[in-house]
């Protein structure tokens, strides 16, 4: 049974009628452009074929009824005519409530809805299960009530819900790629203007995500520290964000900066350059250049931004030893654990899977990896 069929079946069981519509919103992986989003820079993610699915229908009352199929059909009911506050018990419900509340703040005109939510985006792996949920809820209400909201507005609404209602700091990339992703394309996103450019993926290339299963322990405190260091560097150069610093200027006077701050700035400034070049390399089908840029990105994250850990570095080395110049591999996400992403010919996937299974536990204290083979997928919409 597909995720769509499963969600529809639970809807019928819970509400005793057919849903009006079923919609989906995907998770994502970032191919290159790490810690550039909050520096007003560039990122190059793609949506993946792991997604949140919602079967839904309108209600005659002004209530939102939500069933979480993946949490033993836990239920949340709240009114559109009363202040929407965080749920006393269910963390998942806050993502739904936050999206609904922020749609109201945008003066969107909608009534009650019955929703059944299910998904297969791995949680805690840095593949944006939360952004997928936020965009899916927004898309469900938009589709039910024909709300005049663009994909960018749905993404911004999800980001606001996560930042202000749920209380998690995040950039706009995750929601934007979930809302706007295109089949068989990555999306070059300008995080300042929110302009996007669809970048075709080469044929017969797999997007492989490997979870190190190293828990991302320091990520919140270290994220905040890195962000402050980037802001310090931007102030030194008298610009709004590091995106505005010319690389030649930076290299000519980087010695005047605090050494650690200089390293952080060097990563962001060079990563923006790499990301723009990578979009062109990918569009041209130049996997050799793409692989070189992904390698440079990983080295920069390891040595300048200092956000990798030894098991992650080992995992990258194992994959690189198999794919050589036929693709690329690097850590993806906030750092200190989590996942790596690799682009490779479909023909090498099983060879990589075998090499990682055989070699990785020796470098990871006996941990085993989780292996996902993905394709670049369509963003939110009817399914």
Curated annotation (Swiss-Prot):
| GO BP annotation list | galactose metabolic process
**EC number(s) on record?**
2.7.1.6
Site described as Transition state stabilizer, located at 28
Q: Which residues bind Mg(2+)?
A: 130, 162
- The yes or no answer to whether the keyword Magnesium is present is yes
Q: Where is the active site?
A: 174
Lineage, top-rank taxon, reads: Bacteria
Q: Which residues bind substrate?
A: 34-37, 223
For this record, an example GO cellular component is: cytosol
The catalysed reaction is:
alpha-D-galactose + ATP = alpha-D-galactose 1-phosphate + ADP + H(+)
Q: Which pathway does the record list?
A: Carbohydrate metabolism; galactose metabolism
Q: Does the keyword Cytoplasm apply?
A: yes
Alphabetized, the UniProt keywords read: ATP-binding, Carbohydrate metabolism, Cytoplasm, Galactose metabolism, Kinase, Magnesium, Metal-binding, Nucleotide-binding, Transferase
Identify the Gene3D superfamilies for this entry: 3.30.230.10, GHMP kinase, C-terminal domain
Task: Name the positions where ATP binds.
Answer: 124-130
Q: For this protein, what is any one GO molecular function term?
A: ATP binding
The UniProt entry, under InterPro entries, shows: Galactokinase, Galactokinase_bac, Galactokinase_CS, GalKase_N, GHMP_kinase_C_dom, GHMP_kinase_C_sf, GHMP_kinase_N_dom, GHMP_knse_ATP-bd_CS
Stored NCBIfam families: gal_kin, PRK05101.1
Q: Which HAMAP family match?
A: Galactokinase
Q: Which PANTHER family match?
A: GALACTOKINASE-RELATED (PTHR10457:SF7), MEVALONATE KINASE/GALACTOKINASE (PTHR10457)
**What family name appears in the similarity comment?**
Belongs to the GHMP kinase family. GalK subfamily.
Role noted for this protein? Catalyzes the transfer of the gamma-phosphate of ATP to D-galactose to form alpha-D-galactose-1-phosphate (Gal-1-P).
Indicate what this protein is called per its UniProt record.
Galactokinase
Chain's gene name: galK
């Amino acid at each position: 049974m597909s995720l769509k069929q499963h969600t529809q079946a639970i809807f019928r069981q819970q509400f005793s009628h057919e849903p009006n519509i079923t919609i989906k919103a995907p998770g994502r992986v970032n191919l290159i452009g790490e810690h550039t989003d909050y520096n007003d820079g560039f990122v190059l993610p793609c949506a993946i074929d792991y997604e949140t699915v919602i079967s839904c229908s309108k209600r005659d009352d002004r209530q939102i009824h939500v069933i979480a199929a993946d949490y033993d059909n836990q239920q949340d009911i709240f009114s559109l005519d009363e202040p929407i506050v965080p749920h006393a018990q269910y963390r998942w419900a806050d993502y739904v409530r936050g999206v609904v509340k922020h749609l109201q703040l945008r003066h969107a005109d909608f009534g009650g809805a019955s929703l059944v939510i299910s998904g297969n985006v791995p949680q805690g792996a840095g593949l944006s299960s939360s952004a997928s949920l936020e965009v899916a809820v927004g898309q469900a209400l938009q589709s039910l009530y024909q709300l005049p909201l663009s994909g960018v507005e749905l993404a911004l609404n999800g980001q606001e819900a996560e930042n202000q209602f749920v209380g998690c700091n995040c950039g706009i990339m995750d929601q934007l790629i979930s809302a706007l992703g295109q089949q068989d394309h990555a999306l070059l996103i300008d995080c300042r203007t929110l302009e996007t450019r669809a970048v075709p993926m080469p044929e017969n290339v797999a997007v492989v995500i490997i979870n190190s299963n190293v828990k991302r322990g320091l990520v919140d405190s270290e994220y905040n520290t890195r962000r402050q260091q980037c802001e310090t560097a931007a102030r030194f150069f008298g610009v709004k964000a590091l995106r505005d610093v010319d690389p030649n200027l930076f290299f000519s006077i980087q010695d005047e900066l605090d050494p650690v701050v200089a390293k952080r700035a060097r990563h962001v400034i060079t990563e923006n350059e790499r990301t723009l070049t990578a979009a062109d390399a990918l569009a041209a089908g130049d996997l050799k250049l793409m692989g070189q840029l992904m390698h440079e990105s990983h080295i920069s994250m390891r040595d300048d931004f200092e956000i990798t850990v030894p098991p992650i570095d080992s995992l990258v080395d194992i994959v690189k030893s198999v794919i050589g110049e036929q693709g690329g591999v690097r850590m993806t996400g906030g750092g200190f654990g989590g996942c790596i992403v690799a682009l490779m010919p479909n023909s090498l996937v099983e060879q990589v899977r075998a090499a990682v299974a055989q070699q990785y536990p020796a470098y990871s204290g006996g941990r085993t990896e989780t292996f996902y083979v993905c394709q670049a997928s369509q963003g939110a919409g009817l399914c």
